[in-house]
């Protein structure tokens, strides 16, 4: 798949994302990981890839919203798994990586993992998978995110944004709340960046990068 020459920023309402989710989740229950993408002759290949990427990303956010980890696991890369980053800066050697089966059985996993270090405090983040997902994955309803960027980071703060360097062979979708309460003047922004590897006609989830305002 060819990467678009110019990053594309899309402003997508929650209603439109809902429509994308309804289309994406029509893949067969027994399908292999990731949604199967049908090739079309028109529009251009890059446009088709962007559309299919958004459909897959919307399906992933919908599965997260519903805590449907069995469906979520069908999008995880079968050999690379999926890596979780709590604060914008990706560190593949340190960040936790999980397999398809681990994601599928997420709700029953009571083990405590070290996910990184808390911003401002420096204490290690010790959480179960369910606890981490509630705090550093779906900390807002990203199915209703007011801004969505394709291969474009919408909002950033003090943390180093190195997603494209960490995943040079991938594409990503940024679901972002630039501000959740106008009174906070943007200091409460948060985002969920889903990183996908394209292989033939499929998009596979390989990274989940959470972002928020940091000290």
Predicted stretch roles:
Residues 30-62, 66, 74, 78, ...:
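Short, low-complexity N-terminal intrinsically disordered segments enriched in polar/charged residues
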Residues 19-31:
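Hydrophobic single-pass membrane-insertion segments
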Residues 131, 135, 140-215:
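Short beta-strand edge/turn micro-motifs at domain boundaries
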Residues 1-4:
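Positively charged n-region of N-terminal signal peptides that target proteins for export
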Residues 76-80, 86-88, 119, 177-179, ...:
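A mature extracytoplasmic/lumenal domain signature
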Residues 8-19:
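Hydrophobic membrane-insertion alpha-helices, especially the h-region
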Residues 79-149:
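Surface-exposed acidic loop/strand-edge motifs in secreted or periplasmic proteins
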